[in-house]
């Protein structure tokens, strides 16, 4: 977990509340995603860690973002720059996404498999996870050849390891004990 999570939470909450109030949640998530990517740029990272005045830093950051930020998004950047918190933007985005998922009663579910799964397999996993979690789910699929076969499903703190690799690791643990 990043060192900026605690710092990011109030900014994310304020942005989310504003976005809901103005019915622009998608737009705000897009703006935050873009701004978070800008902070990851090598040259921008140097500026963020430099000794620029907050106003100069904010205006430079806004200039780089261009049309991607509306007036309200620019105001958020100015406030964060004033408090020397622009490095927390990736965590603000993450917290914003969590707030959105909670408000929409959805959960992000990560599905890792050795090969791409069919639509039928994905819909079965989705239905099973919706039943288990009692909410809508959004599947994020990853391919990891080290899984060998089967799937690993992660939803929050819950992990369901149905992979061959997981079974082999459990078998090795049993044999060693």
Swiss-Prot record:
It is a peripheral membrane protein. Pfam families: OSCP (PF00213). InterPro entries: ATP_synth_OSCP/delta_N_sf, ATPase_OSCP/d_CS, ATPase_OSCP/dsu. The keyword Transmembrane helix does not apply. Its main location: membrane. Keywords: ATP synthesis, Cell inner membrane, Cell membrane, CF(1), Hydrogen ion transport, Ion transport, Membrane, Transport. One of its GO terms (cellular component) is plasma membrane. Signal peptide: none annotated. F(1)F(0) ATP synthase produces ATP from ADP in the presence of a proton or sodium gradient. F-type ATPases consist of two structural domains, F(1) containing the extramembraneous catalytic core and F(0) containing the membrane proton channel, linked together by a central stalk and a peripheral stalk. During catalysis, ATP synthesis in the catalytic domain of F(1) is coupled via a rotary mechanism of the central stalk subunits to proton translocation. Belongs to the ATPase delta chain family. F-type ATPases have 2 components, F(1) - the catalytic core - and F(0) - the membrane proton channel. F(1) has five subunits: alpha(3), beta(3), gamma(1), delta(1), epsilon(1). F(0) has three main subunits: a(1), b(2) and c(10-14). The alpha and beta chains form an alternating ring which encloses part of the gamma chain. F(1) is attached to F(0) by a central stalk formed by the gamma and epsilon chains, while a peripheral stalk is formed by the delta and b chains. This is ATP synthase subunit delta. The lineage of its organism: Bacteria, Pseudomonadati, Pseudomonadota, Gammaproteobacteria, Enterobacterales.
